[in-house]
Amino acid sequence: MIQVIKIGGGVLENEAQRDAFLRQFAAIEGPKVLVHGGGRLATTMAERLGVETQMIDGRRVTDKVTLDIVTMVYGGLVNKQVVAQLQTMGVNAIGMTGADGGWMKAVKRPIKNGIDYGYVGDVIEVNGAHLRALLDNGLTPVIAPITFSADGLLLNTNADTVASQTAIAMAEAMRREGDEARGNVQLTFCFEKVGVLSNPDDESSLIARITPESYTQLKADGIVSGGMIPKIDNAFAAIEHGVQSVRITHANNLQGGTIIEER
């Protein structure tokens, strides 16, 4: 079993929450991969540098200056803080982006409906064998959501997408090696809520399970909206491509939350 866990930047910017989560992660037995965000920290750094952050429908517009900032924050500050902390907890962590080892390639998102997100990447190729080799050698990859293009551009990429594509690549790599147990990979999205909520202000309104049919209705009713949509889209993409199980949960409860189901 390989566990791929994505942790949101909102947790990482809180020292106590980050420490508690990383201790849980460190306690997980067996091979594991951590994918992290850091959007809020990037916004804070941009403010310090006098750079305005532009968002469209909750998504960051990444111009050249912003790309430099997110690369420094995600691939540098946040990534190395997490790696260093995991090392003190007995985890032989190694920090990386999609450019390291050339394991996650993307294309610059084209302008669509007049919207240009700038240096934002859509993943087109993942080499799961590279990550598997690290895991087989006792290393724990800690992945920042920066990918690269065929012409050498660094690209800001949605961390949920990076996590989903990582899990899919791991599942495919295991199947190629003869493991038919449906990839034997688990994917967990962790953030500040207990899971997907029918009322975002009521923690007791947890939706325990989401199927494609119920997801369609939840979107139509406006219960699921904004940034939760790409998160759930990525969850379903993982399930559809052979990842064994996917859940969305609070960072302090890796076994709780909302389970994403095929049917």
Per-segment meaning from a language model:
Residues 1-263:
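C-terminal catalytic "cap/lid" subdomain
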